[in-house]
Amino acid sequence: MIRPRGWWIVVATAAAVIVATPAWSARNPGLPNPVRTPGAVNARVTQSTIHSTICVPGYSSSVRPPESYTEALKYRQLDGGYNLNGDTRASDYEEDHLIPLEVGGSPTSVKNLWPEPWTVTWNAGRKDALENVMHRLVCDGSVTLATARRVFTSNWILGYEKYVH
């Protein structure tokens, strides 16, 4: 049998892509896969606009996408393999913004939304607590908007340990 040169490169490359993008971060199942969910920001929210956007009471609810959007996305992501150990029960996850709306995350970008598990130690409830703290710190000027966003895109668990504990 004659095989075209390089056929094994295609197979190896395809296998590497599958291996390189697991459903969850290798660091911790409470962190999203950084390839699938790198985070995205709302361009309207900048350091100079925080007092007319995120620091205004009710801002987050004014930009939050409808539940019909986030629930449909959660089901697509879970069915598409973005789940923890094959668990596709939607009730085990909260469709969450990696960069929270409270610090100017994009409301609807799939790069900023992921099915965050409730069933792990570092779960949606803990991240919610950090979101509230970082929002307060940005609005009172204790940290910059860029710093707050980095807390979530780098490793929100370390951010929790630094700012919430």
Please state what every model-predicted region is.
Residues I2-E94, E102-H165:
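Nuclease and nuclease-like effector domains acting on nucleic acids or nucleotide cofactors
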